[in-house]
């Protein structure tokens, strides 16, 4: 799909119902800064036959003030602070909780019903057209951290699209925000999110050495977007339950009881080793999450896995993933703190990066008892080595979403198809 089918785009701002931020600063942690150039994007599709109308959702969206009471930092704006009174050091960004609000976008798609849209093979169109294309900057002091887009389709269906600056929190944090939105739209008191005050490293965190899970680059200034050397593409693989059962039977044994996520990681890793060669894909990054209800980036667990042997199969790669992960949270924190804001860093795509979304219920957004028919998450602002998101298992399939250079993507589709036949 070349041209945008979206019409009648209208933007407005929504601010908290009362003063909650009090202009207080919210400091960004090193883990926030490791995610500074990344954005979480999501779409929630609702087909036409529902107990609520698009007008109901739109009208309630303008009472988002109640939601922003709990998420006051989401309504803030980026500011720059002096670095420990060191005039030679760069300024450090933080969030000024000044109740400036979020953006709400209303739009229409008149050519499609939701059902016809979801029948299209290319799922990259979800985030191209149904999520507002927002990044922070170049006017940082005026850039909203969150955009919500409500798109009405023909015959009553709708899509709610989210663009979420990753400095606010990970995919779990964004999903919790949307769940709370659903509670508000349904007339329920929203659950207040949990934001701890002091990050704590796990006992096995490594503080020694340089982190290889993130990449250091020159400062991007006030336009917070990673520049790619090649054109990036998106694709969704739908692994049926039969595919999953076949892969598990083929590559796991009683002595090697790998998880489905381990096998899917290994399958994609092996495919890209075949495509890119040994030297470019010997190291992968894995993003897990602590079992926690907190909404922030500090609960991310960033690990690396290194492959040393030249000829390695899927079972051997799965064994490395299951048993040889090396956590780097401590090293990441130390690197970013020592840099003192003079450079920028990125995580997704610094190496081939895998993100485990298994613990996230993407379908928690519920409006008047109705859950979405399809949910699609992705990461925007990904480095050239790509990112792979493994979605939670659904009734009929497990989705694996990838963002890769287009040249690799075409070959990856063929490799994966050959491996699951």
Curated annotation (Swiss-Prot):
<keyword id="KW-0256">Endoplasmic reticulum</keyword>
<comment type="function">
    <text>Involved in biosynthesis of the epicuticular wax. Plays a role in very-long-chain fatty acid (VLCFA) biosynthesis and is required for C28 fatty acid elongation in stem. Despite its classification as a BAHD acyltransferase based on sequence homology, CER2 does not seem to share the catalytic mechanism of the members of the BAHD family.</text>
</comment>
<keyword id="KW-0007">Acetylation</keyword>
<dbReference type="GO" id="GO:0005783">
    <property type="term" value="C:endoplasmic reticulum"/>
</dbReference>
<dbReference type="InterPro" id="IPR023213">
    <property type="entry name" value="CAT-like_dom_sf"/>
</dbReference>
<dbReference type="GO" id="GO:0010025">
    <property type="term" value="P:wax biosynthetic process"/>
</dbReference>
<dbReference type="GO" id="GO:0042761">
    <property type="term" value="P:very long-chain fatty acid biosynthetic process"/>
</dbReference>
<keyword id="KW-0539">Nucleus</keyword>
<dbReference type="InterPro" id="IPR050317">
    <property type="entry name" value="Plant_Fungal_Acyltransferase"/>
</dbReference>
<comment type="similarity">
    <text>Belongs to the plant acyltransferase family.</text>
</comment>
<dbReference type="GO" id="GO:0009555">
    <property type="term" value="P:pollen development"/>
</dbReference>
<protein>
    <recommendedName>
        <fullName>Protein ECERIFERUM 2</fullName>
    </recommendedName>
</protein>
<dbReference type="GO" id="GO:0071555">
    <property type="term" value="P:cell wall organization"/>
</dbReference>
<dbReference type="GO" id="GO:0005634">
    <property type="term" value="C:nucleus"/>
</dbReference>
<feature type="modified residue" description="N-acetylmethionine">
    <location>
        <position position="1"/>
    </location>
</feature>
<keyword id="KW-0961">Cell wall biogenesis/degradation</keyword>
<dbReference type="Pfam" id="PF02458">
    <property type="entry name" value="Transferase"/>
</dbReference>
């Amino acid at each position: 799909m070349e041209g945008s089918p979206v019409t009648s785009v209208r933007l407005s701002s929504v601010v908290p119902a009362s003063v909650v931020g009090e202009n207080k600063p919210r400091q960004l942690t090193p883990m926030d800064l490791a995610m500074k150039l990344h954005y979480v994007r999501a779409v929630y599709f609702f087909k036409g036959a529902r107990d609520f109308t698009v007008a109901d959702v739109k009208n309630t969206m303008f009472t988002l003030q109640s939601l922003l009471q709990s998420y006051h930092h989401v309504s803030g704006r980026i500011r720059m602070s002096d670095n420990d009174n060191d005039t030679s050091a760069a300024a450090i960004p933080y969030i000024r909780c000044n109740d400036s609000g979020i953006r709400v976008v209303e739009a229409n798609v008149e050519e499609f019903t939701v059902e016809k849209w979801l029948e299209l093979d290319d799922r990259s169109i979800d985030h191209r057209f149904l999520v507002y294309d927002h990044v922070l900057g170049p006017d940082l002091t005026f850039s909203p951290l969150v955009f919500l887009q409500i798109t009405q389709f023909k015959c009553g269906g709708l899509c709610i699209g989210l663009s979420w600056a990753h400095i606010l929190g990970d995919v779990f944090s964004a999903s919790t925000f949307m769940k709370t939105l659903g509670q508000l739209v349904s007339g329920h008191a929203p659950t207040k999110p949990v934001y701890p005050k002091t990050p704590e490293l796990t006992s096995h965190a490594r503080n020694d050495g340089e982190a290889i899970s993130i990449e250091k680059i020159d400062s991007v200034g006030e336009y917070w977007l990673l520049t790619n050397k090649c054109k990036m593409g998106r694709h969704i693989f739908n692994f049926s339950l039969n595919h999953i059962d076949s892969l598990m039977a083929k590559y796991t044994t009683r002595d090697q009881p790998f998880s489905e996520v381990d096998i899917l990681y290994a399958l994609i890793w092996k495919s890209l080793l075949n495509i890119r060669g040994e030297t470019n894909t010997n190291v992968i990054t894995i993003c897990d999450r602590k079992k926690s209800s907190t909404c922030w980036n500090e609960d991310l667990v960033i690990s690396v896995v290194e492959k040393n042997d030249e000829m390695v199969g899927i079972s051997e790669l799965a064994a490395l993933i299951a048993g040889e992960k090396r956590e780097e949270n401590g090293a990441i924190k130390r690197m970013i703190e020592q840099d003192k804001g003079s450079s920028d860093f990125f995580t997704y795509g610094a190496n081939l990066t895998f993100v485990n979304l298994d613990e996230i219920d993407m379908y928690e957004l519920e409006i008047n008892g109705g859950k979405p028919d399809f949910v699609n998450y992705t990461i925007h602002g990904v480095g050239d080595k790509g990112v792979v998101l493994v979605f939670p298992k659904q009734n009929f399939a497990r989705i694996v979403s990838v963002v890769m250079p287009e040249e690799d993507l075409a070959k990856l589709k063929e490799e994966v198809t050959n491996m699951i036949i």
